[in-house]
Design a protein with these regions (language model features):
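Secondary-structure boundary/capping residues
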Residues: 22, 34, 66-69
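A short gly/proline-enriched turn/hairpin at secondary-structure junctions
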Residues: 34-48
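A beta-strand edge to alpha-helix "cap/lid" segment located at domain peripheries
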Residues: 54, 58-127
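Generic recognition of short, well-ordered alpha-helical interface segments
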Residues: 8, 20, 48, 52-55
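Hydrophobic pocket/interface hotspot
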Residues: 13, 25, 33, 49, ...
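Short hydrophobic alpha-helical module
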Residues: 16, 32-35, 60-63
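Short, low-complexity N-terminal intrinsically disordered segments enriched in polar/charged residues
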Residues: 1-32
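Residue-level preference for long, well-ordered alpha-helices that form the structural scaffold
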Residues: 2, 6, 49, 102-103
């Protein structure tokens, strides 16, 4: 995969995420995609395969009234992209961890994408 192809694929994935369009997100993913959310050095969520990713992504929609991931930086090398992410969201419901509906979340982090067969093979969201 070339750098422009990787960037376009990630931009399409992020657009789907920002629009709550799970179908758009899935169209960018390899069938064996692995997703990990990593916070403070610990894996807090992991999905294996497109079906598990779809289930998690669909469930996550109800948690937000608005959400946006914006690409701040992009570095590509050998089928791997490191992307600096600026994240903004407003919660739609009270969360089990005590975060209340209407809470504004603003974070910066990094996402690492790998690619296989012209699709995203893995995503690590690191905050």
């Amino acid at each position: 995969m070339t750098e422009p192809q990787a960037r376009e694929l990630i931009e399409n994935y992020l657009e789907g995420y920002n629009l709550f369009d799970v179908g758009c997100m899935l169209s960018c993913l390899h069938p064996a995609v692995v997703f990990e959310n990593i916070a403070d050095g610990s894996v807090t969520l992991r999905t294996d395969g497109k079906a598990a990713f779809e289930a998690q992504a669909t469930q996550a929609i109800e948690f937000f009234m608005e959400r946006n991931q914006h690409m701040q930086s992009f570095h590509f090398e050998a089928d791997r992209a490191e992307v600096g992410i600026e994240y903004f969201a407003i919660t739609a419901i009270d969360w089990p961890n005590g975060i209340k509906a209407g809470t504004i979340l603003q974070l910066t982090g990094q996402s690492i994408f790998t690619f296989r067969d012209g699709l995203i093979a893995s995503i690590q969201d690191i905050s």
